[in-house]
Amino acid sequence: MCKKNILSNIKKKKINLLNFNLKKMINFFIKIGEKKFRAIQITDWIYKKQNIKFDQMSNLNFFLKKKLNNIAVIKIPKCIKKIKSIDGTIKWKFLCNKEFIETIYIPEKKRATLCISSQVGCQLKCNFCATGQLGYKRNLLVSEIIGQIWYVINKIKKYNSKKKNFPPIKNIVMMGMGEPLLNLKNIIIAIDIILGNYGFNFSKNKVTLSTSGIVPAINKIAGKIDISLAVSLHASNNTIRNKIMPINKIYNIQLLLESIKNYLKKSSANKGIVTIEYVMLSKINDFQHHAIELSNLLKNIPCKINLIPWNPIKNSSYICSSSKNIINFANFLRKKGFIVIIRKNRGSDIQAACGQLIA
C-alpha cells in the first residue's frame, strides 16, 4: 500500500499511538514516510517526559507536528472520579469508550503499588468477587491498560510538585477488573511497554500478572513473558474450586499446577517463585484439613502463599474467616515450610479492596 493510501485511511479515524509498543511505533512512522528515530522521540515524550501533546514536543519539526495532529492522537482514558480511603488507598474511576473501569493506588511508606484492570468486567464469574458478578463487557485496549499507569504516575508527580507526600509507584499488579490472560494479545504489548527501557522501565520483579488459571495461556506465555506470576487458587480441592470458581470445571487444579511448573521452569522473575492467592471464606475453605490439602498440593512448587481475608460484596452470603482461623491456617502452612503472608485489608471502605471492583 502506498504512503498516500495509508495516510488517507488513517485520516478516517485518528490512530491512538498509546496502543503501540516501540516496534509498532517504528512501523507506524516508517509507513507515514518518517525515519524510525521519530518513534524513539515520541516514546521518550510519552513515557519519560510525560507529555502527550504533539505541539509541545520541541524536537519535532512543524510539518511533522501538523501531520501527526491530522492522523494521530495520544489519548488516555478519562478520569471521572477519584475516591480516597481512610488508609490512604486511592481509587480512580475511568471512562473508556462509554464503559467504566477502576484503578487502585496503594501507598506504603516509601513506595506504592498500582493495581490495574485488563477488561471491562470479567467472564469468569467467581462467585465471591464483585467483578465476576458484573459480567463481561469487553477487553481493554493497550491504550486503556497503559493509560491507567500513565495517568496515575502523572498525577502523583503533580501532587508531589505541590509538596504532597505521595510515594512513587514501584510495583504494577494486574489484579484489577478482568482476567488478563483472556486479553492476551493486548496484555503482551502492554507488558512490553511497562518493562521496556523506552517505556515505563519497571523491573520484571516488580510487575505481577494475576490469573484465575487459564492453563493454555499460562503455557503460551511461558518463556515469552518473564514477570512475576500470581495464581488465584482459592481452594485446596476441585470440589470446592468448582463451586466458587467455574473456570475450574475447564482447567482443574492438577492442570493448573502443571502449567505453573512449566511457567516457573522458563522464568527468572521473582526468583522463580509463584504467588498463590487464597481467599479466606468461613466454613468453606478455612478448616485445618484444607490447610493440609493445600500443603500437599503445593509441596513441590516454589511458591509463597497470600492469604486474603474476604472483602464483603453485595448479594453474597459468604463470610470472611475469623482472624483466629486465618492466623491458625497461616501458622500451619508456615510449619510446613511455606512463606505465608496475610494480606492487609486496604481500601475496603471505598470498595477498592480485592474482589470489590465493580466500577
From Swiss-Prot:
Pfam families cross-referenced by the UniProt entry: Radical_SAM, RlmN_N
- Keywords of this entry: 4Fe-4S, Cytoplasm, Disulfide bond, Iron, Iron-sulfur, Metal-binding, Methyltransferase, rRNA processing, S-adenosyl-L-methionine, Transferase, tRNA processing
S-S pairs:
115-354
- Keyword ATP-binding belongs to the record: no
Q: Which cofactor does it need?
A: [4Fe-4S] cluster
Q: Where is the active site?
A: 102 (proton acceptor), 354 (s-methylcysteine intermediate)
Kindly list the positions annotated as binding S-adenosyl-L-methionine.
Answer: 178-179, 210, 232-234, 311
Residues binding [4Fe-4S] cluster are: 122, 126, 129
Supply the EC number(s).
Answer: 2.1.1.192
Q: Which GO terms describe its molecular function?
A: 4 iron, 4 sulfur cluster binding; metal ion binding; rRNA (adenine(2503)-C2-)-methyltransferase activity; rRNA binding; tRNA (adenine(37)-C2)-methyltransferase activity; tRNA binding
Principal subcellular localization: cytoplasm
This enzyme catalyses:
adenosine(2503) in 23S rRNA + 2 reduced [2Fe-2S]-[ferredoxin] + 2 S-adenosyl-L-methionine = 2-methyladenosine(2503) in 23S rRNA + 5'-deoxyadenosine + L-methionine + 2 oxidized [2Fe-2S]-[ferredoxin] + S-adenosyl-L-homocysteine; adenosine(37) in tRNA + 2 reduced [2Fe-2S]-[ferredoxin] + 2 S-adenosyl-L-methionine = 2-methyladenosine(37) in tRNA + 5'-deoxyadenosine + L-methionine + 2 oxidized [2Fe-2S]-[ferredoxin] + S-adenosyl-L-homocysteine
Q: Where does the record say this protein resides?
A: Cytoplasm
Annotated Gene3D superfamilies:
1.10.150.530, Aldolase class I (3.20.20.70)
- Look up the record and give one Gene Ontology term from the biological process aspect: tRNA methylation
Q: Which residues form the Radical SAM core domain?
A: 108-351
Q: How is the cofactor bound?
A: Binds 1 [4Fe-4S] cluster. The cluster is coordinated with 3 cysteines and an exchangeable S-adenosyl-L-methionine.
Q: Which family does it belong to?
A: Belongs to the radical SAM superfamily. RlmN family.
Task: Give a short account of what the protein does.
Answer: Specifically methylates position 2 of adenine 2503 in 23S rRNA and position 2 of adenine 37 in tRNAs. m2A2503 modification seems to play a crucial role in the proofreading step occurring at the peptidyl transferase center and thus would serve to optimize ribosomal fidelity.
HAMAP family noted in UniProt: RNA_methyltr_RlmN (MF_01849)
Miscellaneous section: Reaction proceeds by a ping-pong mechanism involving intermediate methylation of a conserved cysteine residue.
Q: What is this protein called?
A: Dual-specificity RNA methyltransferase RlmN
